[in-house]
């Protein structure tokens, strides 16, 4: 196994290798215009507290705009002079659409999302927007602490008044940030630790990612779905633990509700169909969009294609395999996972230079799994006899490569995959289906 970097990097570039935001810990940017988008529905007291706290931010006031995005409250929210209000009709829980509406009205280079019931400390905005100002791909998530603010005056300094009334912080979230080094060690499943109540990113990257999915019309999940797409588009995830905002009341998981499990199940089922990565999607059902697409070279004969495709689907049962042999060979074309046409947007594409037989799936599965992390973008696959078999590349690396002419910020890894061998033009099909014979039967 060997590894090589792609491109040369210095700390004045607008990207970092992998997810290495820590390489910019020493840099403070020149302030840029920031738009704070406060999502609101029928919480006038909480909104007033949050807007008061935003007026006390230590970020340059002339570069800070505040937009309240109202999700159809019964009464029009009252906002102070200088705060812009945008509203949409009440058609259920549509926080995703409300946030997008706020973005449409925004003029800032950096977007900072808050919920109306989540009140920031005075240095919150400055700390949240540091990385997105330096790195257009940065997505930062602050620390959402919880307190009972019901008896706290609206104009009380939140940093002094909230700690005495603090409620339990979600342990799963706190522990995840600790394990990952504040998301420095992020991967394909780290979207679960990005919450829209305390979120910031550049306007440019938000637009490139497509914004929030407005089809979400019930509580929860729209921020995770966006964060998944953002990561796949090349986001650099960072938790900023000293950017603190206080949520009025307990975490959702800590509330007493007989419907909480049902709501959680609805969210998980919805996301399972939208996020086709291991640990998030169904374990056996075919995903709506494949996580892995394997592409065979053109002109592979039916026998070789059969052995190759069948062995690949043993290793990756939910992958899509692309081969022009599917047009002619009924035994291949009748499987919905096999196609003659390549897809246009999958998480990982494995391009084979030669047809292969996978006699031991585990080494190949481990090699492809490396692409779930942040640092490696391409894996070159070599057989035990030194034959170059092909290469796998992540969508994340491809998106960054297109974005930056100087490179994609990922490493390339060369892996010898034991148990995977090149297939000759007429492999012994009976040996394959019967499960007998070694690699020489298929060469």
Predicted regions and their residues:
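N-proximal low-complexity "stem/linker" segments adjacent to membrane-targeting elements
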Residues: 1-56, 265-300, 431-439, 443
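Short, acidic, metal-binding catalytic loop of nucleotide-sugar glycosyltransferases
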Residues: 52-63, 310-319
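A conserved acidic beta->alpha catalytic loop
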Residues: 67-78, 118, 324-329, 353-355
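Glycine-rich, basic loop-to-helix element that forms the pyrophosphate-binding segment
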Residues: 88-106, 333-342
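Short aromatic/hydrophobic "clamp" motif used to bind/position activated sugar donors
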Residues: 111, 349-351, 355
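Conserved donor NDP-sugar-binding/catalytic core segment of glycosyltransferases
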Residues: 123-169, 361-394
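A recurrent flexible, glycine/aromatic-enriched loop bordering the glycosyltransferase active site
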Residues: 168-170, 181-200, 378, 396-413
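Acidic donor-binding loop at a coil-to-helix junction in glycosyltransferase catalytic cores
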Residues: 218-225
């Amino acid at each position: 196994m060997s590894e090589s970097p792609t491109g040369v990097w210095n700390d004045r570039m607008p990207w970092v290798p992998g997810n290495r935001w820590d390489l910019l810990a020493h840099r403070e940017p020149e302030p840029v215009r920031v738009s704070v988008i406060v999502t609101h529905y029928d919480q006038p007291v909480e909104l007033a507290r949050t807007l008061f706290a935003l007026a006390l931010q230590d970020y340059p006031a002339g570069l800070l705009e505040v937009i309240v995005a109202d999700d159809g409250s019964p009464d029009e929210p009252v906002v102070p002079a200088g705060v812009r209000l945008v509203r949409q009709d009440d058609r259920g829980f549509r926080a995703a659409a409300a946030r997008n509406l706020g973005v449409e009205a925004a003029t800032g280079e950096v977007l900072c999302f808050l919920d109306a019931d989540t009140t920031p400390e005075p240095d919150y905005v400055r700390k949240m927007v540091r990385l997105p100002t330096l790195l257009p791909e940065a997505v930062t998530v602050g620390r959402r602490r919880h307190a009972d603010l019901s008896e706290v005056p609206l104009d009380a300094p939140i940093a002094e008044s909230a700690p005495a009334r603090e409620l339990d912080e979600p342990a799963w979230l706190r522990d995840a940030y600790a394990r990952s080094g504040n998301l420095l060690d992020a991967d394909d499943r780290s979207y679960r630790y990005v919450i829209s109540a305390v979120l910031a990113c550049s306007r440019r990257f938000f637009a490139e990612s497509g914004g929030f999915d407005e089809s979400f019309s019930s509580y929860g999940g729209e921020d995770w779905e966006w964060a998944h797409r953002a990561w796949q588009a090349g986001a650099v995830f960072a938790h900023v633990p000293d950017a603190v905002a206080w949520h009025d009341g307990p975490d959702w998981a800590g509330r007493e509700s007989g419907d909480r499990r049902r709501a959680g199940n609805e969210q998980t089922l919805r996301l399972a169909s939208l996020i086709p990565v291991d640990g998030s999607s169904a374990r056996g059902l075919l995903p709506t969009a494949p996580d892995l697409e394997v592409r065979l070279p053109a002109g592979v004969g039916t026998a070789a294609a059969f052995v190759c495709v069948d062995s690949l689907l043993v290793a990756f049962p939910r992958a899509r395999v692309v081969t022009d042999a599917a047009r002619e060979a009924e035994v291949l074309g009748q499987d919905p996972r096999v196609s003659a046409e390549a897809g246009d947007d999958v998480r990982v594409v494995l391009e084979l230079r030669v047809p292969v037989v996978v006699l031991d799936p585990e080494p190949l599965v481990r090699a492809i799994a490396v692409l779930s992390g942040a640092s490696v973008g391409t894996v070159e696959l070599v057989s035990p006899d030194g034959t170059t078999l092909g290469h796998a590349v992540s969508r994340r690396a491809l998106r960054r490569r297109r974005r930056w002419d100087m490179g994609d910020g990922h490493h390339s890894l060369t892996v010898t995959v034991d148990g995977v061998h090149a297939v000759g033009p007429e492999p012994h099909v009976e040996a394959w289906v019967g499960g007998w014979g070694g690699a020489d039967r298929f060469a």
